[in-house]
């Protein structure tokens, strides 16, 4: 399971790769988003088709199309070099694969659109790195999806997409991208050499926020009160995971003390 996906939605404000997630405006059924449920079994990689258009523009365009019907295409996520925008829940169908109303691409694949920066290698590299990190989170959340089930839009309809990878822009091709996903997956699965020993901390401030992950960028899910003691079972960047499974708290010396 991924701690960055909750109820088939990315956690708003969390970090994936170089990007901050924007997921506080999930589309309801409309002209572009059909509202059918699905069990995702693959991920489809797209390019948006226009250079230097920021992800927020595509995010807003999908909202506009869903409301007024000027276009029926839809997709789950737009990846930019600094933001990841989710528009459709991962357990809902989006019209992105072009293989028809009942095609496996449309009905069972998570569609990821990627911003294009054909003249900016650094931005484009970050887009692909963010995408690889996102794919790993999706693979953790939906174990049926493995590396073989991350496919190009071309796989479904023979459309020349994702264009930049298919045409090796900046030397980045499909083989390179799949290795990027593999490397990201291995980095998050790397076993720790030291066994962690749980310990107890006492809260020394009036209220201490509990968050879904080890950073203030994660969603707040509760509070702990001054004087109470809790067991920490994992550490990450001076944050501690609560034994209860509720979430993470800061381990800063002005917030907690070891018992």
Protein language model annotation of sequence segments:
Residues 214-219:
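Short alpha-helix capping/helix-loop boundary micro-motifs
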Residues 221-258:
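SH3/SH3-like beta-barrel superfamily modules
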